[in-house]
Swiss-Prot record:
Gene3D superfamilies the record matches: 3.40.50.970
Record protein name field: 2-oxoisovalerate dehydrogenase subunit alpha
GO molecular function, one term: 3-methyl-2-oxobutanoate dehydrogenase (2-methylpropanoyl-transferring) activity
EC number: 1.2.4.4
Acyltransferase as UniProt keyword: no
Organism: Pseudomonas putida (Arthrobacter siderocapsulatus)
Subunit relationships: Heterodimer of an alpha and a beta chain.
Keyword Magnesium belongs to the record: no
Pfam families: E1_dh, OxoDH_E1alpha_N
GO BP annotations listed: branched-chain amino acid catabolic process
Amino acid sequence: MNEYAPLRLHVPEPTGRPGCQTDFSYLRLNDAGQARKPPVDVDAADTADLSYSLVRVLDEQGDAQGPWAEDIDPQILRQGMRAMLKTRIFDSRMVVAQRQKKMSFYMQSLGEEAIGSGQALALNRTDMCFPTYRQQSILMARDVSLVEMICQLLSNERDPLKGRQLPIMYSVREAGFFTISGNLATQFVQAVGWAMASAIKGDTKIASAWIGDGATAESDFHTALTFAHVYRAPVILNVVNNQWAISTFQAIAGGESTTFAGRGVGCGIASLRVDGNDFVAVYAASRWAAERARRGLGPSLIEWVTYRAGPHSTSDDPSKYRPADDWSHFPLGDPIARLKQHLIKIGHWSEEEHQATTAEFEAAVIAAQKEAEQYGTLANGHIPSAASMFEDVYKEMPDHLRRQRQELGV
């Protein structure tokens, strides 16, 4: 007689479903200011505790607490606030434009604005970011033209990518923003390779790689960590844990009773787990990781704990798989509201300025959209010739494409 019970496959389940409020206790939160700040030359193994705790600076009253509460220039905080506000207003307007069938698709970053903007302001513009489709706040922090961004979304005749990328797959070299790929996890290995090349050339530029919680299940994630560790690549490896990979709960990729940051330590990489809705913590952690990279001390992995407040995309309905009011119960709050509270408390923002800035960006986005739509929209605009599909792909067109173009008669 077999002494063992039949085996059962374990499949992680979300702690909340429609009609049932989410239990967020799995997040392992601690109070602001409790996480220690190690020296930049810390050994990776000595960051194990930081990969399971949470670096937080702003408390519930809006005060900066603990060793990560750096003396940040208030102008940086103001730039961060403006970038986050602009991102949120831009996102809201573009979702409406998609519903009006002016573009085919859109993905907003509602609730995640601090992560991209905070790191963008902590890096140099010459550093290269390898983002996913939810880091448009990097572009906002670096003042990229709203008209150019909207033309890409509309796939119109002024689209710098000529309609060959999905909307929101921007490519802005002059802003240190590498071409977004629709294939998940590819940018992680690309960033490590770019960082290795920078080191080989003896340059001073570093790379910043981005990935979502779900895509960490891809093999490219593990390949990137291996190469980054072995060659001490000057790269920041960002894992945005927004709790959901489309409709799949984050534990399906990350497992239970562990963290994504813990994987970095296991690969010999100094790792942090950070409150991604705390702009001050984002900026401080990003500066720490950038300093490690610039000093030749190797890569750092940062898990940003945040929440995808909106749908995965305009093709998604999150009410089918999670509580409709989930974001209102998320314990780390709204990044804009938290930084606003802090700035007002230190005397560098006001309710009046907040309203004025909101109105400023609403007007700017509306004006940029009107200008961009003059070059066409998805529903109304120039239709490229069949010949254009062969252009601007290769510097010198190869023979097989010449033959194909001749067969089409274009």
